[in-house]
From Swiss-Prot:
Residues 4-234 form the ABC transporter domain. It comes from Salmonella typhimurium (strain LT2 / SGSC1412 / ATCC 700720). One of its GO terms (cellular component) is maltose transport complex. It is a peripheral membrane protein. Pfam families: ABC_tran, TOBE_2. Changing residue 165 to N: Loss of transport. No effect on ATP-binding activity but decrease in ATP hydrolysis. Retains repressor activity. Signal peptide: none annotated. Target for inducer exclusion, mediated by the unphosphorylated enzyme III of the phosphotransferase system for glucose and resulting in the inhibition of maltose transport. Acts as a repressor of mal genes. In absence of maltose, the C-terminus of MalK interacts with MalT, then MalT becomes inactive and the mal genes are not activated. In presence of maltose, MalK is tightly associated with the MalFG complex and has no affinity for MalT. ATP binds at residues 36-43. Its main location: membrane. This is Maltose/maltodextrin import ATP-binding protein MalK. One of its GO terms (molecular function) is ABC-type maltose transporter activity. It catalyses: D-maltose(out) + ATP + H2O = D-maltose(in) + ADP + phosphate + H(+).
Amino acid sequence: MASVQLRNVTKAWGDVVVSKDINLDIHDGEFVVFVGPSGCGKSTLLRMIAGLETITSGDLFIGETRMNDIPPAERGVGMVFQSYALYPHLSVAENMSFGLKLAGAKKEVMNQRVNQVAEVLQLAHLLERKPKALSGGQRQRVAIGRTLVAEPRVFLLDEPLSNLDAALRVQMRIEISRLHKRLGRTMIYVTHDQVEAMTLADKIVVLDAGRVAQVGKPLELYHYPADRFVAGFIGSPKMNFLPVKVTATAIEQVQVELPNRQQIWLPVESRGVQVGANMSLGIRPEHLLPSDIADVTLEGEVQVVEQLGHETQIHIQIPAIRQNLVYRQNDVVLVEEGATFAIGLPPERCHLFREDGSACRRLHQEPGV
């Protein structure tokens, strides 16, 4: 196992900068997830750690060794790709031991490692099968096993679940989490799926247009996003945003005016906030309240009702706001499309963002953070 450090790492192709001044500390045995939209540079960052992409400037360390000029095969990393890339004419055991065979490992060593990893991944009964006889989840486990038998110090996974159906993704997500707990290896995982990031990670790195937007534990990013981008990316359905204007400030409070002219005091850091400033109020769909238990409410027309059984998601068009708000309740809510529906805003669950997108620090203490 080993730690990974990136110091001012930049990657550019000509004038196009895809990763800019990346600084990260990944601790020994940590499970870190790089998450962000397509094109944010997360896979490029992983490939630089693997040695598959050169670093334009900055330094990469694995353990105590600077790795910028070290070939991929000598870095002690193992990588699992979105594609299984299994040899169809080889058995599961032969696929898993292929890298060791090329490296000149003895047959006894190969057999021992393959059998050990097969037990961990529940593949022992499948070692003689060919890939065509395996399910998608089994093939992905073989690809993971092929990397594990090489005993890498750092384990890299580039969107390994993207080719699987929804049910299989959930199953494999659980298996990868169990695998990390059992092995204690340093793992770096790339995904665009924020649910995977929230459920797997010890620490999440949110990337936006080649920069690190925020690094933190899953609940920290959920409850205390550093900016509007992170707030909108982490959480599903995503956070609602309302245009507001600052009408007053006090110590550790900011008063804003909502689109319906109601005013609400928010428990957020007020330093640097100017009266009259245009800002954005954010609130998650699951934090909105029924209007009868809230002091500050918004009313609008129901556009869409999504009944999911265990919860209801209601899309509401609020006058003077171009986009819908989404209200989420963990129950069945019987309401017709076109009906008038009111929702409440609890001040302690609201977020406030400046015009540049940065967040005013929330002062309400959330559990588990």
